Each structure stands twice: as C-alpha cells, then as structure tokens.
C-alpha cells in the first residue's frame, strides 16, 4: 500500500516537472531557437547512426554542418532584436552574447571539414566525434547566454565533459591518455574552486543567483566590500582561468595540445577561449562591479605572466602543436587586455575583433598541421624544412597564417593587435600594452624561424618526411584544404577592410 502511494506520488511529481518544462520550452523556445537547431541535429545523428550502416557517413557530416550553418542563419536573423531574459531569468539574449555564439558556431563549422579526412585515415568513430563536437558547441552557446550562477556552472561542464572525451579519443595513444587524465583532474579541481566562489557570491548577496540580482543583493546586504567577495573573486578567477588557460593556469594546455588528435586541438584551442571570454566579461563586469580595481589587478597579473611566459617558452619548442599551445597562452594575454579595458574605451569591441581574427589564424595553422601530419606522420618543426620545394601551396598557407599570428602588416593579425593595443593605451594601460608589444616581437621571432625552415630548407636539413612527401595539386576536393583556404583568406583580407568589422563589434556592446 505504501509503495503504491509512493509510486503515484512519483508519477504525479514527474508529470508536473514535465509539464513545467514543456511550458517553459513552449513560451521561451524562440529565445533558444539556434540551440534547438543543434539539438535537432544531435537527434538526427543518433537516429541515422542507429538505423543505418557506415555507407551513410557523408550524411553524418552533412547533417552536422547543415545544423551549424542553420544555427548561424537563425542567429543572424535575430540580430539587432531587443535584449530579452527568458527561462525565469536563466538565459539572456542580446547582441553581445550572440556575437560570441556566432564565433563558437563559426569555429565548429570550420572544424568539421578539417576533421573529415583525419577521421577516415585514423579510423576513429565518426558519429561519436560529431556528437561530442555539437554537444560541446551547444554547451558553449548556453554559456554565452547564461544569466545565473547555476547555468554558468552547468553550461561549461557540458562543454568540458565533451572536451575530456574528445581529447582522449585515441584510446591507444599513451600521450593522449596521459593528457586526458591531467585535463580531467585539473578540470574537476577548477570546477570545484569555481563553485566555491559561487557559494560565497550566493551567500553574500542574500541568496540571489541571477547576475544583476546579485548586485542588488550585495547593495541591500552591504556586503560588496566584504572579505567574502574577495574570496569569491579569487576563486572565480581561478575557475575561469582554467578555461582561458592563461599563465599560471596553463599546465594542462601543452600536454593536451600535443597528445590529443589535431582536429580536436584545433576545436578546443578556439571554442574554449571564446566561451570563457564571454563568460568572464559578464561575470567580472556585473557581480563584481564594486570590486573593479581588484579584478583589474588580478587580470593584469595574468595577462603579463601569459604574454611573457607563453611567448618565451614557445621559442624552445620542437613540436608544432606544443609551440602553438604556448603561443595560445600568449595570445590569451592579449585578449585579457580587452577584458580589462571593458566597455568604456571599446575594449570589448577590440577583443571581439581580435578573437575573430584569431579564430581564422589559428584554425588555418592547424589545418596546415593536420594536412602535413596526415601526409608525413610527424609534427616536429624540423621536419617542415624545405616543404616549399614539395608543396608550395601548403607552405605559403602556413607562412601566411603564422605571419598573421605574429602581427605582421598588412595581415589581419596586425590590425587586430593594433586596435587592441590602441584601446589599452587609451585606457591608460601603458605598462600592459608595452609588455604586449615586446612579447609580440618575440613571437615574430619564432614564427619567422619556422617560415625560414619552410621556405629555405637546405638539402642536408631536409628530413625523409619531406623528401618522400606526396605533392598535392593546387586545386583539390580535400575538405581540409577547403577549411585552410577559407582561414587563410580570412587571415589576410579582413585587415584591409577593418572599419565594417569594428562597427559590427561596437554594435554588440551592452
């Protein structure tokens, strides 16, 4: 009898929860329409995988790419609409959040064609790979629009869990397993610290979880200058720091970059930074409005350490992927300058602009690494010597992307850094900008060192990997080359037409 009553109560409670969820989705679904497209794509992938054979592999790529493109289209149609808060305050849609969602979708759209040939050559499971990529993209998009502490914690965990699985996708590779274990342990520790910071913020604000309500709660409780807020600030900075991977929270980055499959590294190197940057700007700018001097100081320290350590250690690397890992640590130092400058001096606009260029530069470089790795089986920098003699197209593409990363005019990377540093200088961050300029010169050195190897490798320096290299035609149906061409063009041409890009970025501010 007791069991029967409990069973009825369980059914009633489950029905109420389902009806409430259906009601929320019915009246708020339009606010997450781009995310719903991705969810529908995920369901289609699962259905095709369960009901068909491996001959339908092209359909899997087509559905993944189409769902991403449709999601981008839905975002563009929603552009310039009035800011809205939905799902009982859990989610916010505005131009600022949507530009970051667009960047994440752009990353994923470029990464899928970059992965096609790699997956086929390495015989990795296709459906699971695409499912993890789309789910991670979904988590990143929800993080960009998150408006309360619970969503800000759950969304990056969705992204992180898929990242752990993707980084350990080659289970038989010892380096991949080691990198995944380190990534998982450090990710779990950072999430715990992040929740600890949220608990202090929740308690100090009188039990509020929405970002703007936390500010009002801190004013009502007079706790905005309390030691608890300082503890929350430090803990949240550490938690977000792991996602952004600035120094000294970068320990996982080189190992994961080196040990994970190259398309996975390409995906993680940009999407994690875009999503974490979107979250960082809103968390620091809204709940910690009264502690702006403190978080500015913390981020300045992180930016200086990242720019110096990232670029100096990159000089000594012998692996291309490991070199790009330390390079990305230096690059995030530049992005942090935009976060510190904030909304007042176009800091966020400069950060968004540079992030757009960084996506093209970084993914273009990784596309070259994927292509070279599939044809030679190595990513050692020495083995790139003399590549121009065998494959001028690949060598020139690599050189353009590396020069753009270094900030050589008239490429996009130069104008992105110029705008970012100019905004920092206007905001009075003279020391930080000076460090950025000096470390940019250092980065040019190790990028040029690689380009010199590519173009002028002597016969005695050319390794068997390049001697036996299979020449590729200039025009090819190779999907990796398609992504590479798009990224190379985006790394060069936008530098000439900066004004429209800056205008769009400025239009996204709060």
From Swiss-Prot:
Spans traversing the lipid bilayer: 31-51, 57-77, 99-119, 124-144, 149-169, 183-203, 229-249, 295-315, 323-343, 354-374, 395-415, 418-438, 484-504
A single MF term (Gene Ontology): NADH dehydrogenase (ubiquinone) activity
Superkingdom per UniProt: Eukaryota
Reactions this protein catalyses: a plastoquinone + NADH + (n+1) H(+)(in) = a plastoquinol + NAD(+) + n H(+)(out); a plastoquinone + NADPH + (n+1) H(+)(in) = a plastoquinol + NADP(+) + n H(+)(out)
EC number(s) per entry: 7.1.1.-
Biological function: NDH shuttles electrons from NAD(P)H:plastoquinone, via FMN and iron-sulfur (Fe-S) centers, to quinones in the photosynthetic chain and possibly in a chloroplast respiratory chain. The immediate electron acceptor for the enzyme in this species is believed to be plastoquinone. Couples the redox reaction to proton translocation, and thus conserves the redox energy in a proton gradient.
Protein name: NAD(P)H-quinone oxidoreductase subunit 2 A, chloroplastic
Provenance organism: Nymphaea alba
Protein encoded by which gene: ndhB1
């Amino acid at each position: 009898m007791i069991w029967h009553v409990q069973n009825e109560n369980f059914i009633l409670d489950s029905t109420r929860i389902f009806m409430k969820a259906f009601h929320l989705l019915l009246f708020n679904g339009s606010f997450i329409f781009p995310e719903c497209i991705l969810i529908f794509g995920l369901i289609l992938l699962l259905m095709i995988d369960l009901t068909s054979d491996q001959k339908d592999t092209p359909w899997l790529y087509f559905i993944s790419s189409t769902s991403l493109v449709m999601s981008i289209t839905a975002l563009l149609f929603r552009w310039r609409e009035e800011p809205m808060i939905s799902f009982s305050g859990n989610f916010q849609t505005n131009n600022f959040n949507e530009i970051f969602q667009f960047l994440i979708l752009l990353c994923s759209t470029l990464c899928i064609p970059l992965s096609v040939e790699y997956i086929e050559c390495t015989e990795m499971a296709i459906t699971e790979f695409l499912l993890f990529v789309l789910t991670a993209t979904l988590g990143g998009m929800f993080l960009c629009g998150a408006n309360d502490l619970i969503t800000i914690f759950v969304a990056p965990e969705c992204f992180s869990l898929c990242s752990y699985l993707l980084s350990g996708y080659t289970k038989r590779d010892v380096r991949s397993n080691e990198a995944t274990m380190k990534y998982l342990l450090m990710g779990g520790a950072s999430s715990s610290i992040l929740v600890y910071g949220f608990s202090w913020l929740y308690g100090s604000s009188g039990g509020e979880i929405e970002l703007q309500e936390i500010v009002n709660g801190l004013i009502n409780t007079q706790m905005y200058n309390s030691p608890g807020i300082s503890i929350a600030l430090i803990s949240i900075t550490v938690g977000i720091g792991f996602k952004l991977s600035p120094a000294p929270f970068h320990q996982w980055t080189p190992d994961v970059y080196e040990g994970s499959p190259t398309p996975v590294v390409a995906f993680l190197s940009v999407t994690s930074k875009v999503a974490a940057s979107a979250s960082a700007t809103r968390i620091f700018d809204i709940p910690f409005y009264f502690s702006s001097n403190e978080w500015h100081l913390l981020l300045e320290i992180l930016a200086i350490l990242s720019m110096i350590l990232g670029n100096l250690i990159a000089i000594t690397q012998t692996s291309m992927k490991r070199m790009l890992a330390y390079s990305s640590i230096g690059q995030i130092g530049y992005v942090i300058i935009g976060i510190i400058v904030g909304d007042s001096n176009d800091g966020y606009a400069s950060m968004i602009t540079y992030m757009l260029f960084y996506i093209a530069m970084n993914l273009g470089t990784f596309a070259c690494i994927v292509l070279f790795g599939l044809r030679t089986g190595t990513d050692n920098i020495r083995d790139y010597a003399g590549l121009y003699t065998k494959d001028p197209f690949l060598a020139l593409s690599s050189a353009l992307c590396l020069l753009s990363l270094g900030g050589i005019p008239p490429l996009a990377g130069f104008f992105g850094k110029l705008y970012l540093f100019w905004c920092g200088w206007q905001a009075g961050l003279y020391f930080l900008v000076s460090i950025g300029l000096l470390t940019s010169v250092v980065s040019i050195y190790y990028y040029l060192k690689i380009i010199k190897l590519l173009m002028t490798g002597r016969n005695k320096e050319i390794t068997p990997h390049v001697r036996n290299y299979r020449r590729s035609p200039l025009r090819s149906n190779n999907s990796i080359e398609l992504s590479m061409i798009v990224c190379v063009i985006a790394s060069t041409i936008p530098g000439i037409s900066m004004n429209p890009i800056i205008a769009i970025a400025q239009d996204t501010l709060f």
